[in-house]
Amino acid sequence: MTDFRQDFLKFSLAQNVLKFGEFTTKAGRRSPYFFNAGLFNDGASTLQLAKFYAQSIIESGIRFDMLFGPAYKGIILAAATAMMLAEKGVNVPFAYNRKEAKDHGEGGVLVGAPLKGRVLIIDDVISAGTSVRESIKLIEAEGATPAGVAIALDRMEKGTGELSAVQEVEKQYGLPVAPIASLNDLFILLQNNPEFGQFLEPVRAYRRQYGVE
């Protein structure tokens, strides 16, 4: 594990993107933490987020030729991360999709560079995996190849079965998923920072009940 993962979690805490307490997930589970990437909503925080994505993508070793951001959250992530990758000497095109097809102007659902080669999907999290599945269909329909998925946080918890949403994507499509940080990294943060000590046991219990290896 490299320090940037811990730096990302601390940054998320400072931005109130990551919170500890008692929360109810969409699946109806009582969770001791909550992560809302939508709160990276100003220029400075989006810039820093994109730097973390770029570093995570480079360290993952995934081979890719361009980025694709599924609407809507993935749009700004693809654009901002492409800028940060360019600063690191990796200049790649990016594209995104519209929710509704246009019948005038550019037309269609795709905007940006043509989907070609190995395409890395970038999103905030993988919950049900719907966004990833739709992205894969779009990419393959254009004759390109999905290369993997970059996300901000892997919650590492079971879905309806024994696998997590991330593991299901990896198994079903054979694609690598590169998170900036995971539940394991969050657990390390709690262990190493006494000010968060009260949340260590609740997170441990949650991981024991819902977590995956």
Swiss-Prot record:
RNA-binding keyword on record: no
UniProt function note: Catalyzes the transfer of a ribosyl phosphate group from 5-phosphoribose 1-diphosphate to orotate, leading to the formation of orotidine monophosphate (OMP).
The protein's name in its UniProt record: Orotate phosphoribosyltransferase
GO CC annotations on file: cytoplasm
Gene Ontology molecular functions: magnesium ion binding; orotate phosphoribosyltransferase activity
NCBIfam families: pyrE (TIGR00336)
Residues spanning the membrane: none
Keyword Ribonucleoprotein: no
Cofactor: Mg(2+)
Family membership noted in the UniProt record: Belongs to the purine/pyrimidine phosphoribosyltransferase family. PyrE subfamily.
CDD domains the UniProt entry points to: PRTases_typeI (cd06223)
Binding residues for orotate: 34-35, 127, 155
GO biological process terms held by the UniProt record: 'de novo' pyrimidine nucleobase biosynthetic process; 'de novo' UMP biosynthetic process; pyrimidine ribonucleoside biosynthetic process
Pathway where this protein functions: Pyrimidine metabolism; UMP biosynthesis via de novo pathway; UMP from orotate: step 1/2
Pfam families, alphabetized: Pribosyltran
Binding locations of 5-phospho-alpha-D-ribose 1-diphosphate: 26, 72-73, 98-99, 102, 104, 123-131
Enzyme class: transferase
